Regions:
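Bacterial Sec-dependent N-terminal signal peptides
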Residues: 1-23
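Lipid interaction determinants
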Residues: 19-170
Length: 170
C-alpha cells in the first residue's frame, strides 16, 4: 500500500516537473494582428528563476519622398512571473522596455542612399518612442494568463479579455 502511494506521488511530482519544464527555457512565438491588420510578432520566455520577457516586433513598409523603405521595430520588455497551477501572473516592466528600429532602403543608387540614411537616422529616436507606445498599447493584455493547454511545442493561453492566444516553439 505504501509503495503504491509513493509510486503515485512520484508520478505526480514527475508530471508536474515535466509540465513546468515545458514552459521554461523556450521561446513561445505567435503572430497577432492589430486593428489595421498589420502583423505583430510576439515572443514570450519564462525562466526557472521567475523572470520572463516579452518581445514584440513588427514590420512597416512606407515611402519617404517616393522611396520605398521597410522599417522593422522591436520592443523587448523584461518582467517576472509566478505560476499557480494553470495561472500565469506576469508583471512586465514597460518602463524598462528597450526599443530597436532597423530599416532597409530599396531601389536607390548608393549616393542617394547615404543621404537618406542620414535623414532617417536623425528620425530614429522619434520613431523609437512612437513604435514603443504603439506596440505596447496595441498588445492584448498579457498580465493575467490562464494556461488552456501546454504541450512540448504549443502553449495556448487565455487573457483577461477572454482571448485565446496560441504560442508555438520554433
Amino acid at each position: 500500500m505504501k509503495k503504491t502511494i509513493f509510486t503515485g506521488l512520484l508520478m505526480l511530482i514527475t508530471a508536474l516537473a515535466v509540465n513546468a519544464q515545458n514552459l521554461t527555457g523556450k521561446q513561445w512565438c505567435t503572430v497577432l494582428n492589430d486593428e489595421d491588420g498589420q502583423g505583430i510578432a510576439v515572443a514570450l520566455t519564462f525562466e526557472k528563476n521567475g523572470s520572463c520577457g516579452m518581445l514584440i516586433a513588427t514590420q512597416q513598409d512606407m515611402k519617404e519622398d517616393g522611396v520605398p523603405i521597410t522599417l522593422i521595430a522591436a520592443v523587448t520588455v523584461p518582467g517576472s512571473y509566478k505560476r499557480d497551477g494553470s495561472n500565469l501572473n506576469n508583471q512586465f516592466n514597460n518602463g524598462k522596455a528597450k526599443v530597436e528600429v532597423d530599416y532597409e532602403i530599396k531601389g536607390m543608387d548608393a549616393k542617394t542612399k547615404v543621404l537618406l540614411d542620414k535623414q532617417i537616422k536623425g528620425e530614429i529616436s522619434t520613431l523609437k518612442k512612437e513604435f514603443k507606445q504603439v506596440l505596447l498599447d496595441g498588445m492584448p493584455k498579457m498580465d493575467q494568463l490562464k494556461i488552456v493547454s501546454l504541450e512540448s511545442k504549443k502553449l495556448v493561453v487565455r487573457n483577461d479579455d477572454d482571448q485565446e492566444i496560441p504560442f508555438y516553439v520554433e
